[in-house]
Amino acid sequence: MYCQAMSLFRAAEGHRPQWGPWGVALGIMVGNLTLDKRKYADVEPDIKELIEKSQSLMDELKHLTDEDARVFEPLSRAYGLPRGTEEEKAAREAVMEHALLEASLVPLQIVEKAYESLTLLEELGEKGTRIALSDVGVGALFARAALEGASLNIFINTKLMKDRTQAEDLNARTEELIDKGRALSDKVYGAVLKHIK
């Protein structure tokens, strides 16, 4: 089991922290440990579907983590643009506004996908093998870390946006997902804890 988890982590990782993919990788591991067991024959089709969805989601989260770093680069460069004249200030402000939006939209996708991973982990916690149930709980913690970590990237960018309507819309969507994600993470973790303790 440990070797399987490590190979999934290696598949999920890059050169950046990958909390979201790691959480999904743990779900995949639980799913794989459930397959071909007589005790779980009734739910095997569901487990196979959950593994497939989780694999796709893990790939999306890995891509988004890399994309998050990529969209930050223009924002980082924009901070260094000249602002000595009014024209330079206006040009810098326009570049900054666009870069802040781009640097908020990708983390929002991470928040959405992290929440989606919690829904998959919830179902794996209900249907998956009991011998690896603790991994569902850890996966939920990783998913929550991804969700809340990405939300901080959104908030730090929206705070600087001049378009307050857009900033408030992004914040509202993020806060809604944080609330739902915290509740679901607590539910999944709590169910695991109740079963194993």
Q: How should each PLM-predicted stretch be described?
A:
Residues 1-15, 39-50, 54-57, 89-96, ...:
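Disorder-to-helix initiation segments
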Residues 110, 117-120, 132-191:
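Preference for long, well-ordered alpha-helical segments
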Residues 33, 38-39, 75-82, 149-164:
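Acidic, Mg2+-coordinating active-site segments of isoprenoid diphosphate-utilizing enzymes
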Residues 1-28, 131-150:
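Conserved phosphate/anionic-ligand binding catalytic regions in large, soluble enzymes, centered on
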